[in-house]
């Protein structure tokens, strides 16, 4: 049988070739760099560029869908404003990152030969802007989740106040560590100030704690959404209304946000992949928040078109707003008994 052409280039032991060193003349003299190190460096650059390109495409597609399919009334809602701002900030950061990756700052001569004058001034400015945009993205995402927690807990003022305080504390903690990490990175870029020597699994401790706190914040908010929506769905099932509607749509997205960010954070924190992987947690959350509302709106319109006249007796009016909140009101008929009313109060 005829062998493929690449079989002619197979050697029994290729370890000497794989682990060979390349001599690079730098401004401090000649240095030996393993080929495997250069391969890993270029692979990281390629994977990061692919990830950022995917984030940019997702962000542009999502913002177009949100602007075209959202009503003018909903565009004035604070949740819409924060969601749109987070998507725009994410797209802007992706563009700046892509320009930086394609510049001379990632050249082998710059990183191993230390010829830093090859890096243009705009690259340094873009690097600082990238660091400044990170807290903006975190802030807009956290504010969006906090507002939605207040909305979904609006039926109980005490619960709403407690959840708002917890959400605000998480937001402040997450922002504090992200801003601390941002300041350290900017000081290093401008004045080569050494980063903190204390590291956790290879990351600087402010960055690692910021990532863990952000993932925990997402899990907390998604857990609140999932619990409230699941409880509302059970109530609707008890009163005989169980179509696949906006509540189920948002519940699916909430459960996805409950699981996926934690998984990505664990992978990125303890299994070192590549530089661009850490931004996937933010990207998935930012994309999921507006998409859940669009999906719920579409499903609500379908249910509205299929709506038929209500049965005689107790009329249950289910008013579902697609900003992760719901109202269930019971309108009693003439023969509505007091015992039935007390039973209904347990559902609401």
From Swiss-Prot:
It is a multi-pass membrane protein. InterPro entries: GPCR_STE2, STE2_TM1-TM2_sf. Keywords: G-protein coupled receptor, Membrane, Pheromone response, Receptor, Transducer, Transmembrane, Transmembrane helix. One of its GO terms (biological process) is positive regulation of conjugation with cellular fusion. It comes from the Eukaryota. One of its GO terms (molecular function) is mating-type P-factor pheromone receptor activity. It is found in: Membrane. Belongs to the G-protein coupled receptor 4 family. Receptor for the peptide pheromone P-factor, a mating factor of S.pombe. Pheromone signaling is essential for initiation of meiosis in S.pombe; P-factor signaling alone may be sufficient. This is Pheromone P-factor receptor. It comes from Schizosaccharomyces pombe (strain 972 / ATCC 24843).
